[in-house]
């Protein structure tokens, strides 16, 4: 497999009243297509900043970011947004569903920014990914009518709807109880087994062990890169009744 993502000496600084705060220091990293990677470390170590750069929500101060063989380091905000909408799927800790849109409408939202796709095609694609996360029976419901676990599965469907090259998940189980967290992690196992590339930020060591590879950050630096040769085996997909969550 070829490298889907390659970071070369990536640094990121923020400036407040001309005072520089360096959040990332010389990150070198390669993620191969089809890998499941966990990004770990204490709060404030730079995990979310790195994920923002990977997701093209921000640009590095220094270094090169190669995504799908394209150097995206120096692109404008609009250029980054265009690539992001096609190649990257996000799953956030707080779900980030729009309260006055239905489940189906929330999932279709990323498709609405693409030209040349009809509403009928958007509906069909939304139905397809909602079936994948076992939420197709809730298409007409609103977020307030769903449990936390159900909302996060809708958020995963939204991340999948564009057939992204990579799924970036920032503490996807952070707002969930243990049962719902396990259901979401099991869903990630399933998606990875189907070929998805996933990079997940997590504080939970057990969650990190489900990934093939664990990256550890400390003070803005990548200090560990471990292959999880004895990673936890994925829970059987029928071991949890997702519809009950």
Predicted regions and their residues:
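ABC family nucleotide-binding domain
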Residues: 3-217
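C-terminal end-of-chain micro-motif
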Residues: 1, 37, 242-245
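Conserved beta-strand-loop-alpha-helix hinge in the C-terminal portion
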Residues: 221-245
């Amino acid at each position: 497999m070829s490298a889907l993502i390659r970071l070369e000496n990536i640094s990121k600084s923020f400036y407040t009243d001309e005072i520089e705060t360096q959040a990332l220091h010389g990150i070198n990293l390669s993620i191969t297509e089809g890998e499941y990677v966990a990004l770990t470390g204490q709060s404030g170590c730079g995990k979310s900043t790195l994920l923002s750069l990977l997701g093209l929500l921000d640009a590095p101060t220094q270094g090169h970011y190669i995504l799908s063989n394209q150097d995206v380091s120096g692109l404008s905000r609009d250029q980054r947004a265009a690539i992001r909408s096609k190649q990257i799927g996000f799953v956030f800790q707080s779900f980030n569903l729009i309260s006055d849109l239905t489940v189906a409408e929330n999932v279709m939202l990323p498709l609405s920014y693409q030209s040349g796709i009809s509403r009928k095609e958007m509906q069909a694609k939304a139905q397809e990914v909602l079936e994948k996360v076992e939420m197709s029976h809730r298409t007409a419901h609103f977020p307030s009518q769903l449990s936390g676990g159900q909302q996060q599965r809708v958020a995963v469907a939204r991340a999948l709807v564009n057939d992204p090259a990579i799924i970036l998940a920032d503490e996807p189980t952070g707002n969930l109880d243990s049962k719902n967290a396990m259901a979401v992690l099991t869903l990630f196992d399933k998606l990875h087994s189907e070929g998805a590339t996933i990079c997940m930020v997590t504080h939970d060591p057990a969650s990190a062990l489900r990934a093939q590879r664990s990256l550890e950050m400390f003070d803005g630096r990548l200090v560990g890169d471990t292959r999880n040769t004895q990673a936890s085996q994925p829970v059987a997909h029928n071991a949890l009744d997702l519809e009950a969550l």
